[in-house]
Amino acid sequence: MLSRDSISQTGQFFNRILPKYSRIPLLFTVVLNFSVYWGARAIAGSFIHHNIETSLDDMIPVVYPTVVIYFGCYIFWIIGYLYNAAMDKRHCYRFLMADWLAKAVCFICYVVYPTTNTRPEIVGSDIWAQLMRFLYSMDAADNLFPSIHCLVSWLCYIGIRGNKKVPQWIRTTFCICAI
């Protein structure tokens, strides 16, 4: 049975990680993110999509194990958004407002200039090929430019990069993850 002290400590830990002032704005951020992707897809799905591949894209091989990096980015983004939201109320709101404005720009771009690319065929049946197929099944080859993946990675880093209260190793780690 949990004691009052352990429940209180759990609540204090939760409030440090996810302060009350950040909960609704962070929830709105998640809803907005999906709305931008799915809303743009619903509006521009039948529009002509522009293939933005270059000859460089044709020269870069698909290396299936790199799918781990893609899925690992979600962990980085969650940590990055929680970290930035927990810094203080003003920082949280500025950080999330930057996200919301940037996502509005992305939405406009996705509707005005829909983009796509040609994905290579995934061959094989090992775990890496299966993970790539799973990725392709859940992440359509549209809404590519501008890249929300790059956007949120960079936001996570720039949200903390100049803050001397954030340990240098965390700032460096965020920078490496963003790149």
Label the model's feature ranges.
Residues N33, N84-A85:
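Alpha-helical transmembrane segments
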Residues I43-S55, A85-W169, T173:
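Membrane-interface loops
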Residues L2-F76:
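N-terminal transmembrane-helix/juxtamembrane module of multi-pass inner/ER membrane proteins
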Residues I176-I179:
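Membrane-interface alpha helices of multi-pass inner-membrane proteins
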Residues V67-G80, H149-L155:
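Hydrophobic alpha-helical transmembrane segments
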